[in-house]
Swiss-Prot record:
Assembly with partners or alone: Component of the HUSH complex; at least composed of TASOR, PPHLN1 and MPHOSPH8. Interacts with MORC2; the interaction associateS MORC2 with the HUSH complex which recruits MORC2 to heterochromatic loci. Interacts with ZNF638; leading to recruitment of the HUSH complex to unintegrated retroviral DNA. Interacts with INPP5A, EML1, SV1L, GPSM2, ITGB3BP, CNTN1, ETFA, PSMD8, S100A10, MPHOSPH8, TMEM100, ALB, PARPBP, HCFC2, NCBP1 and SETDB1.
GO MF annotations in UniProt: chromatin binding; RNA binding
Record flagged with keyword NADP: no
Biased composition (Basic and acidic residues): 927-938, 1532-1545
Recorded name of the encoding gene: TASOR
Modified residues (Phosphoserine): S344, S633, S636, S673, S800, S843, S927, S971, S979, S1103, S1552
Keyword field: Acetylation, Chromosome, Isopeptide bond, Nucleus, Phosphoprotein, Repressor, Transcription, Transcription regulation, Ubl conjugation
Phosphothreonine: residues carrying this PTM: T982, T1049
Similarity field: Belongs to the TASOR family.
Source species taxonomy: Eukaryota, Metazoa, Chordata, Craniata, Vertebrata
GO cellular component: heterochromatin; nucleoplasm
Protein's name according to its UniProt entry: Protein TASOR
Region feature (Disordered): 1-110, 921-947, 1532-1558, 1638-1670
């Protein structure tokens, strides 16, 4: 932003321009600061100095100017007046000059500026050029030209001549080559730059003739130099340019045309090729300087085209001279001045009336001096703020913009007639005059002119929230008043938000000020109340107060003030309102006051100010202390007491969170409003005391009674409490733990779980309601809890059971909200608890409200121990360990994820509990002792190992991003032998996880319960679930986590499933033990090994100590998927599953990881043990089916017949086995096929083919690939770069190939491009759209439809995949023509132009299609556009015509669709189009249902783009299947194909034995270098053949998604960027990025669980806006 005070930083432009010898006295008097101040038509004239060489040099310069002017006279008719320049006074001297000619100096030695002496012939020539270019002849009397100089720039003059020569060579007319002059008024600091470097584009803001960024604007007339008329006395500098107009194009005035065509069409503002100048067609109509828009309409617009772009400086514009002028206007000002304005400030008339000079100093701009100024006032004796000696102003604002922020009335001088501050709209204002201290300079004048001309205001921020504005006097004149005379002063306007002075005012005149101050300063008034009270009280005993203890006396009375405010019995002090009538009284007291002590007080006040200060912190302490006195109650006498129960200390203290305090205070107010019954209170106290003595004595009661305040400081708490407060702000409550059962209510809703070790759990509870909760629990545990006593407690506290429950509920909600604020939390949806430990056999107890009907005790035990809790008999207790058959959905198992210490560790460590809510109901069947005893004696077959009794995990880490899985993997004390799925997830952070993972789905399991109980349970669970889900969503919104709500309600199927909630599950579990399961597993594996040995083959043993890199050369097996003991329960296997397809699936998922642990634990005793790769229920007879049923490829691998195979497998560590699995996945990714597209045989294609085949890759025709491809197959299509334009559209099935992400395209020039990965990637991502005339037909398309389409396109386009609409210029031109008469067409055109600026719409240049005789776009045009935009993957042709007639378009790789179909069925039409954010678009194959594909598969196939054609080592291509994905595939087919659940279950059971069989066929080791591939094809039934192929394809896709660790670097893995050759290792960061893909898979599976019926789902899915799918 240009400012009048910024420009002093500019350096002097030129020695001859800034200083010198000659000149008149006026110019010599100019201050040096003027040269650095910004001028634009104002400011003191040019400081042009004459050279000191004497008259000879001067006359020589004049002679040169005359010679140059003699052949540079204007030839244009508009400059005809310049041809006859007056020479009369100089005629007698010419003969003399001819006889004394001085030799011309070389042009190289000339300075940039050649000064001209006023009165010389050269000076007159320049003036005549100006006079001849006036619009009005009367302007001659208004302009006074004081200084002039010629500009000599050899470079610019040479380019000017070259431009003229070029135009002449092009055959231009002499009229076009004629030279004339144009003018530009510039600021002083710009003169040097323009004359040195020429006039560059961008110097103007006018747009009437063309874009100012592409050309330059110059004035045609020398007296029309700016848009506004010049003011009298204005000074400025004019640069005269020598110009060649060239070929001129006349431009219509866009404001004069009714249609907005020119404004909407950006190309209308562009320069015209083959032209050099634009002029307005209305320029000849301008006949007066005061005509409307005269300045804009009389401009020249010059530009110049280079070879392919516009030049930044047109060469046919050359600076010729610079002239300094002064403007004087003959118009007389009105003599009549209204009498009402006679009191307004006028510097010239009233300059002597200013009595006060309030400040003198320097006005600076960015540290540089502008001028010396002073501030004066006639009525005000003080400034509102102390100003420094140097006032540095750096900010400038537009006066119009400022008046939008501040009321315009503040800028009228008549507002400030009085002596006082003016209060307007809450602002206190005062006005002063700023005058220049000396009369020798003109910087103030030039500054005034600059501010007037550009309507600017100087702004200086001040302290105390104030501002200083320096304004021109013209800006202080009301719009209806005329400024009578030129002023030489500025106005200084001070604005503050608070009053700056104390004034004695007349009666009633100050009512407004205090009132407004009262509204704007409430906090100050609050402080003033107790200060006034304190000072009034101090004044009563002022003689007795020494200066030393004055502040302590004030503190005493401030404390008393607060006591009165909180109802201590004394009357509350009320400050009387301010009475303005007392301002007029000189003496407020009738008698004189005693002031004998004033000297001592003043001395102390000056030299010891700290005595008279009251710190805010001290004030807060006083406030808190006195407020607590009111909150004290009889019950709170004991809330600071410390009690011991079973070695556990329980303390009540301060909550760490402010919100908690607010909730507490609200509850306290409600309770204190009731009267306490003293008898009941005593009864409660006696109960507490009795319980305290019976538990642990009363040793520290007296000590704790000294700490009866509600909110203790942190340092008063014990050490372990301080640790708790430091580690977590969630430590708001401390729950009491005993060996006796604690009641649990609210169906386990309370999230605040705590674990203890020894006696270390202390936390504060800050109100009597928690005291009530603890008391109720204590009474219940002591068997003293009956209905009457509970009611007594409730009534004594004024609280109902519902209130207590609601309070606990609010506390839980708050904890959920505050949980994600902690960085300690691994997931945003997990509640975390600090300082909770275990030791020995202490149980984890879930504590919630004591009013619940049912309760649960959870027992724990160390590994290898038989410790158990001895619970008291209570038929309402039920052990969570017995909920084995309680079927949960995979997203919400009963899972707490405890991390345990090792048995030998006695250290206290912080642990985490990641929890989920589960519905629990109690039964009345048996006592807990019986249950626990049975579990201690014999472990239930369905139970996990002792280490995992409390852990219910999903199978095979079905959802690896689940917070529970991550928590287990991070455990350092207890490690799960995780599966290959979970190994890749150990770096996942909370940002990678969306909360779709925490949806609760509670599926109750078996046996009947009365309908009323079932409905109650269901309602309760749904209520708790909805509350939990809502809070989680609020947390996500606070954290700005992008989350699409896919919440599904818990599934309650039949009454049959509700039965099991009321039965002890141990009676329903299988009798098979863990050891029996392991023995059976060994027998099965031995049978498999013996059958495999019959095939023959060799498999050398490998030492378990071999590194992963060595074992990598011996790939065995698929990755291991453990099987739980429930897999052998044939009863459950064969029962119908159609009623609840999730039930058994989830049951399996609960046991999978535990089975893996069991297998690992039992390895030392069973040397031949192997983990089974089936996650599904496998009947015994199905497991013994012959292996020959599975179809094999002809190149089956021989399996080792040696018995060493079993030993080798048994010796493998799980980590080694997992590494082998990852290696297999790496090998699987290297199965890449290629196709070389060539029209004619070439040597290059033959070399590339031989090279790729040598690497082990196979050639595959695209049609064969589409017919037979599997999900893991990848295809690379290679074409020579020179063939792209002519033949790439002839690739077979190009449209279908583009839809698949596993297909990539490469353009090569040589074999080295393949070897060195320097090929050109083709069809990478995104796409573009081409339409015909029907899409933009105003009769067919509405504005709303077009807007929807463009919005869809905008949402579709991303940085990774850009989409664009390419419109033929023929259609745009037609819209322009229609827009002149048709408003709808104009709206369409306007909308199109808006998106053109966003680069979403591109107007194609004119080409063959745009001919009137041809229909655009033609097929050849689309093919050419496809080749030109080779990086964009898709080309879509939109039309509203019959699509069936355009089948030939599809054969050439072009998608044809209507606009509506494009938006509704985008994913079906286009498929893959974005390499980064491809989340919801399906995979499209030749034999697949396009609408039924899962977004999960597409996410998986992102990694399949990492395609490799060289197989590194000589490893066979083994396609690995994962059984887990049969579940996902099952859910997909349920949602997309519309099959019923029973059929899906049957397919699942059919796939299980095939997976078992695949175990036999995938154990491979090759001694030879043969490359073979084992393709698993299921032939289990005729109808399931193709279906199960899809299933295995899904498995393979999901497998390929997982990344390999760095130890497999000897495998060659190629991406689009690294196509062939060099192997590389995947970094951990890449692995972590790919882990994010699990997220969408997790969410997608949950989506299907809650989706509507398959047909309607598919329909609604296809119609969803793409913006929601991305």
């Amino acid at each position: 932003m240009a400012t009048a005070v910024e420009t002093e930083a500019c350096q002097p432009t030129d020695a001859s321009w800034e200083s010198g010898g000659g000149g008149d006295d006026e110019m010599k008097q100019a201050l040096p600061e003027l040269e650095s101040s910004q001028q634009n038509g104002g400011g003191g004239g040019l400081n042009i100095a004459e050279p000191s060489g004497g008259a000879g040099r001067e006359e020589n310069a004049g002679a040169e100017a005359a010679q140059s002017l003699s052949h540079e006279q204007p030839q244009d008719s508009s400059e005809a007046g310049a041809a006859a320049l007056p020479r009369g006074p100089e005629e007698p001297e010419r003969p003399v000059r001819r006889s004394f000619q001085i030799p011309r100096k070389s042009r190289e030695k000339k300075a940039l500026f050649q000064p001209l002496t006023p009165g010389s012939r050269e000076f007159e020539d320049v003036v005549n050029i100006l006079h001849s270019s006036y619009l009005e002849p009367t302007s001659v009397t208004n302009f006074n030209y004081r200084r002039a100089c010629l500009v000599h720039n050899e470079l610019l003059e040479k380019e000017f001549t070259e431009k003229r020569r070029e135009l002449k060579f092009d055959g231009r007319l002499d009229k076009e080559l004629s030279e004339s002059y144009a003018f530009l008024m510039v600021d002083r600091y710009q003169v040097q730059t323009i004359c040195e470097k020429g006039l560059h584009v961008g110097q103007s803001k006018i747009t009437i003739l063309g874009s100012p960024s592409m050309g330059v604007y110059l004035s045609r007339y020398a007296d029309l130099l700016q848009a506004n008329p010049l003011d009298t006395g204005a000074m400025g500098d004019v640069v005269i340019f020598k110009i060649m107009k060239g070929k001129i194009k006349s431009i219509y005035d866009p404001m004069g045309v009714k249609s907005l065509e020119s404004m909407l069409n950006k190309s209308a503002l562009d320069p015209t090729p083959k032209h050099e100048c634009h002029v307005s067609k209305n320029a000849n109509r301008i006949t007066s300087l005061l005509a409307y828009r005269a300045y804009e309409l009389t401009q020249y617009y010059f530009y110049e085209y280079g070879f392919d772009e516009l030049r930044r400086r047109p060469r046919h514009v050359c600076p010729y001279a610079v002239v300094s002028f002064t403007y004087k206007d003959d118009i007389q000002t009105p003599k009549f001045v209204p009498s009402s304005r006679s009191n307004s400030f006028n510097t010239d008339r009233n300059i002597d009336k200013y009595n006060y000079t309030l400040w003198k100093g320097q006005l600076l701009n960015k540290g540089k001096l502008l001028c010396y100024i002073s501030l004066r006032s006639a009525t005000r004796a003080f400034l509102p703020i102390k100003l420094p000696e140097k006032l540095d102003v750096e900010t400038v604002m537009s006066i119009d913009h400022l008046k939008q922020k501040i009321p315009p009335a503040l800028f009228y001088k008549e507002t400030y007639l009085g002596p006082n501050e003016v209060l307007k709209n809450g602002m206190y204002c005062s006005l002063y005059e700023v005058v220049e201290k000396t009369r020798i300079g003109s910087n103030m004048e030039s500054l005034l002119q600059k501010l007037d001309r550009e309507k600017l205001v100087l702004v200086k921020p001040l302290g105390d929230r104030g501002y200083l504005f320096l304004l021109s006097p013209y800006q202080m004149v009301p719009p209806y008043e005329y400024q009578t005379a030129k002023s030489r002063v500025l106005h200084a306007l001070f604005l503050f938000q608070e009053p700056r002075s104390i004034v004695t005012s007349q009666k009633g005149s100050t009512n407004a000020a205090p009132q407004e101050r009262h509204e704007s300063m409430p906090d100050v008034l609050k402080i003033a109340q107790f200060l006034q009270f304190s000072l009034i009280q101090c004044r009563k005993e002022f003689k007795n107060i020494s200066a030393i203890n004055f502040h302590s006396v004030v503190e005493k009375y401030v404390s008393e003030f607060f006591k009165r405010g909180f109802g201590s019995g004394k009357r509350e002090f009320i400050m009387f309102p301010y009475d303005s009538r007392l301002d007029d009284k000189k003496f407020l007291y009738s008698a004189p006051r005693n002031k004998s002590h004033i000297d001592t007080c003043l001395h102390a006040y000056i030299f010891r100010p700290e005595v008279y200060q009251l710190p805010i912190c001290k004030l807060k302490e006083l406030f808190e202390e006195n407020r607590k006195l009111q909150q004290f109650s009889p019950l709170s006498d004991y809330e600071g007491q410390e009690e011991e129960m079973n070695g556990t200390k329980m303390k009540f203290g301060k909550r760490n969170n402010s919100r908690g305090e607010a909730i507490i205070s609200g509850k306290q107010r409600s309770s204190h409003s009731l009267d306490y019954d003293k008898d009941r209170v005593k009864e409660l106290i006696n109960l507490i005391q009795c319980r305290k003595k019976s538990v642990g004595g009363d040793s520290d009661t007296e000590d704790m009674r000294s700490k009866t305040v509600l909110k203790r400081k942190l340092e008063d708490l014990p050490e372990n409490m301080r640790k708790l407060a430091k580690t977590s702000n969630l430590s708001e409550n401390c729950h009491l733990y005993e060996e006796s059962p604690q009641p649990i209510g609210s169906l386990g809703h309370d999230a605040d779980l705590r674990r203890q070790q020894q006696d270390t759990c202390n936390s504060g509870i800050a109100d009597i309601h928690r005291l009530f909760n603890w008391l109720s629990e204590t009474l219940a545990n002591a068997r003293h809890s009956d209905a009457s006593l509970t009611d007594t407690v409730n009534k004594a506290l004024g609280l109902s059971t519902d209130d207590a429950y609601e309070e606990l509920r609010q506390k839980h909600e708050y904890e959920l909200n505050s949980t994600p604020d902690k960085k300690d939390y691994e997931q945003p949806t997990c509640a975390k608890v600090e300082n909770a430990q275990f030791k020995g056999t202490q149980s984890l107890l879930l504590e919630v409200d004591a009013t619940s009907k049912y309760s649960v005790a959870i027992s724990t035990s160390e590994v290898g121990t038989d410790h158990k809790l001895h619970l008291k008999e209570d038929p309402n207790l039920i052990s969570v360990n017995n909920f084995e058959d309680c079927s949960l959905c995979p997203s919400v198992p009963i899972e707490h994820g405890f991390r345990r210490q090792q048995s030998k560790s006695n250290n206290v460590e912080e642990t985490e509990i990641h929890w989920k809510l589960i519905p629990i109901t109690g039964g009345n069947a048996r006592s807990p002792e019986d249950q626990l005893g049975k579990h201690g004696e014999k472990q239930t077959p369905g139970m996990k190992s002792p280490e995992e009794q409390l852990v219910c995990v999903p199978p095979q880490e079905a959802f690896p991003n689940d917070p529970r899985v991550i928590n287990r993997q991070r455990s350092s004390d207890y490690q799960f032998p995780s599966s290959p799925f979970t190994d890749t997830l150990k770096g996942t952070t909370e940002d990678d996880v969306l909360t779709g993972q925490v949806e609760e789905q509670c599926v109750p399991a078996a046996e009947a319960e009365p309908p009323a109980v079932s409905e109650t349970t269901e309602r309760t669970v749904l209520g708790e679930y909805n509350l939990f889900s809502r809070k989680i969503e609020e947390i996500l919104k606070q954290k700005n986590v992008s989350y699409v709500s896919t919440v599904s309600t818990p599934i309650f199927s039949t009454q049959e499933k509700m039965k099991r909630l009321s039965e002890f599950i141990y009676s329903k579990t299988s009798k098979a033990g863990v050891q029996e399961f392991v023995d059976g597993l060994h027998e099965k594996l031995n049978t498999i090994i013996i059958k495999a040995s019959a095939k023959g083959g060799n498999l050398p043993p490998v030492s378990p100590n071999d590194s992963g890199a060595k074992i990598a050369s011996n790939p065995l097996e698929r990755h291991v998927i453990p099987v739980s003991s429930s897999d052998f329960n044939n009863k459950h296997l064969l029962e119908p599953l159609c009623s609840d397809p999730l039930k058994d699936t989830n049951s399996d998922e609960q046991h999978s990881t535990s089975a893996l642990t069991e297998v690992e634990m039992n390895q030392p005793q069973h040397a031949t043990e192997l983990m089974v790769t089936s996650d599904h229920i496998v009947p015994g007879d199905m497991a013994r089916e012959p292996v020959e049923e599975t179809t094999k490829s002809p190149s089956d691998v021989n399996i080792s017949a040696q018995p060493a195979l079993s030993n080798f497998i048994s010796q493998l560590e799980p980590e080694v086995f997992n590494s082998l699995v990852k290696i297999m996945k790496d090998v699987q990714k290297n199965t890449v096929k290629f196709y070389i597209h060539e029209e004619e045989e070439s040597v290059l294609c033959k070399e590339i083919k031989e090279y790729l085949i040598k690497l082990g890759n196979t050639e595959c025709h695209p049609e064969q690939f589409l017919e037979r491809r599997s999900k893991l197959d990848k295809l690379l299509i290679i074409i020579q770069n020179e063939d792209i334009a002519g033949f790439i559209h002839k690739i077979p099935g190009l449209v279908t190939l583009k839809k698949l992400p596993c297909v990539s395209f490469a353009g090569v020039d040589s074999l080295d491009d393949v070897k060195n990965h320097t090929y050109n990637e083709l069809f990478v991502s995104g796409g573009f759209i081409v339409s015909d005339e029907s899409i933009l037909n105003p009769e067919v398309v509405t504005v709303e439809n077009l807007k929807n389409f463009l919005t869809f396109l905008e949402e579709l386009s991303t940085p990774e995949g850009k989409w664009q609409w390419k419109v033929h210029c023929k259609f745009q031109k037609k819209l322009k023509e229609l827009g002149r008469l048709n408003a709808k067409a104009l709206s369409l055109l306007t909308l199109l132009n808006v998106y053109q600026k966003k680069h979403l719409v591109e107007i194609l240049s004119y080409h063959n299609c745009d001919s009137q005789t041809r229909n655009a776009p033609e097929l050849d045009c689309l093919i050419r556009l496809q080749a030109q935009n080779i990086q964009q993957r898709h080309i879509v042709f939109l039309t509203e015509k019959n699509i069936k007639m355009l089948s030939s378009y599809t054969d050439n790789g072009i998608v044809v669709a209507t606009a509506e179909d494009f938006m509704q069925n985008f994913k079906n039409l286009v498929g893959y189009h974005n390499s980064i954010t491809e989340e919801n678009l399906p995979q499209l194959g030749a034999n697949e249902n396009l609408e039924s594909q899962s977004a999960l598969l597409e996410n998986d196939e992102k990694d399949e783009e990492d395609m490799s054609l060289d197989s590194g080592d000589e490893i066979s291509h083994i396609e690995v299947c994962s059984n887990f994905h049969s579940e996902i595939w099952e859910k997909e087919t349920k949602g997309s194909r519309g099959t019923d659940q029973k059929k899906n279950t049957q397919i699942e059971l059919q796939s299980s034995p095939d997976v078992q069989n695949s175990l036999l066929e995938d154990k491979t080791y090759l001694d030879s270098e043969e490359r073979t591939s084992i393709d698993i094809v299921c032939s289990e039934g005729e109808n399931s053949n193709s279906t199960e192929q899809d299933s295995y394809s899904n498995f393979q896709v999901y497998h390929s998604q997982l990344n390999m660790s760095h130890q497999f670097s000897h495998f060659n893995v190629l991406t689009h960027q690294t196509f062939l050759g060099t192997p590389y290792a995947l970094s951990s960061s890449q692995s972590q990025e790919n882990e994010n893909y699990f997220l969408s898979a997790y969410t997608e599976s949950l989506d299907r669980d809650k989706s509507p019926p398959p047909l309607s789902w598919g329909k609604s899915d296809s119609s969803r806006p793409y913006s929601q799918e991305k």
